[in-house]
Amino acid sequence: MKKNIVCSIFALLLAFAVSQPSYAHTVSPVNPNAQLTTKAVMNWLAHLPNRTESRVMSGAFGGYSLDTFSMAEADRIKQATGQLPAIYGCDYARGWLEPEEIADTIDYSCNHDLIVYWKSGGIPQISLHLANPAFTSGHYKTQISNSQYERILDSSTPEGKRLEAMLSKIADGLQELENEGVPVLFRPLHEMNGEWFWWGLTQYNQKDSERISLYKQLYVKIYDYMTKTRGLDHLLWVYAPDANRDFKTDFYPGASYVDIVGLDAYFDDPYAIDGYEELTSLNKPFAFTEVGPQKTNGGLDYARFIHAIKEKYPKTTFFLAWNDEWSPAVNKGADTLYLHPWTLNKGEIWDGDSLTPVVE
């Protein structure tokens, strides 16, 4: 069911979306029913690498909803650089909690700040550190067998019902954002090629074809639930394997289910990140979907990261740096990262009337 866009900003964005030249090459979301604003953002994002400057959106993680989430990370970035991140992230799922009902691990109270952020010139990102449906709650880092995975995929089992209880509450939160006309960079089931989350592999760099198939089924199940069952048409779907593990594209659910591909990359040398060529070969817009230093001693020079993007990873459309000790604000080079000619910050996505120009 289509939702009315209630803010003049969104109306202007709609006007922008339908006023683009008919000869322009348009990149559309995988959801054919995507809202016009979401379509406009997708096309605009996909064309960022054609620009000569202002072509890589900055991003920061704001924390876990009803836990660590606040605007403090944005404020720290502003204090360090004079700029605010173009993208601000919240995680709806506190998968380590063990309440009586697994759905209570989900919270979306961060939506209020995300709506304000969008209306003032930024874009929200939602991630999910999901609790493990093989248990009554919690255990997001507890490994499960493939047979347990199969039970999670089966809607008739207690495990399947627990998954669907979480998905229902997540969809409620996403619905709030859609009602306000807010497009979302949605990054579920990330770092699946690692062995630390229940939805991923169980052994270090050991390929498991059955596990990969089960993951794809889970991803598609979530996509179908959000898009078809709940009719959410404001999501841009982000596929994000870990840069420090193999099998980065093996888990790829298919071009019909992914809008943006990226790498979650923790590094000491930004010139040595693995997987860029592999991910860009999927012919989707590319991003560094989660970044930070491997050594959390304040020594990472983020200036080298933006220089590496320009020299080695030029198709990058955005980055999202983790908060706390991984933040640019407590490492080196934050000002260079945010003030680099290639970087695009909050307020530079739309100019007050429409999205900034698409460059063919």
Language-model region placement:
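Bacterial N-terminal signal peptides
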Residues: 8-17
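N-terminal module-boundary/linker segments of secreted carbohydrate-active enzymes
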Residues: 23-105, 306-307, 348-349, 354-359
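Alpha-helical scaffolding within the catalytic cores
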Residues: 41, 68-77, 108-112, 170-172, ...
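Loop/turn elements at helix/coil->beta-strand transitions in domains of secreted/extracellular proteins
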Residues: 52-56, 83-86, 120-125, 179-185, ...
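Substrate-binding cleft of secreted/luminal carbohydrate-active enzymes
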Residues: 56-62, 289-360
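Substrate-binding cleft of extracellular glycoside hydrolase catalytic domains
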Residues: 97-228, 232
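Glycoside hydrolase catalytic-domain groove-lining segments
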Residues: 246-298, 333-351
